[in-house]
């Protein structure tokens, strides 16, 4: 029954359904009781599911925020009509970690140290790793525990302070791929992107699956659109940058980026 409510969203897991049920309850509470609710940190797929749910019920009084612009992991706020929620209203605290530049700390190192303090994954937002400095966005209720207990990440000593000055710039490295495909089907485009045969591409999508804009699919026939991102486990993540016209033989010229 619950799954039927969300038939416009295919391939939902039980966790997805629980999230959507909870958000649906929040919408009702905001409408009927003027209650504002904040979620824990959501990953990109969960954020997308929430946005699709809001669009399906035409509910506009919500906001997703992760502590800084273009955050991947974000909290959802659902609020009543005529209400307003500012960035500073979200229960998010940024923590900056300082350490020696020669200490090469990774995202995994920081996340592992937080898990070692029994901080749950949904209490941790984005982790930005720089040279001699990193930042982590936390649910405010756990920030005090982290600042008082976290003194080392791996073997590196760290000094923590509350706040983030925006000085860590993360450059996403990409490799451009261009070529022609017979159609905009997923198996055709994955074949070009991963440099494998179309037959192998189709089998991969059927057996392993493909994530398109964070939504899992298993049909090689699904059509990809300009601007979408897609990934297959073991082959990487790609973005369809542009569709650049057709050749004399009616093949479609496309340009992709592979995230490296």
Which functions belong to the PLM regions below?
Residues 201, 210:
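Short hydrophobic/aromatic patches on the structural cores and recognition surfaces of FHA
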Residues 227-228, 234:
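Structural motif
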Residues 204-205, 224:
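Short, well-ordered loop/turn sites that connect or cap secondary structure elements
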Residues 1-193, 216, 223, 236-260:
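Ferredoxin-like alpha/beta domains used as RNA- or RNAP-binding modules
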Residues 212-214, 233:
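Short strand-turn-strand beta-turns centered on an Asx-Gly dipeptide
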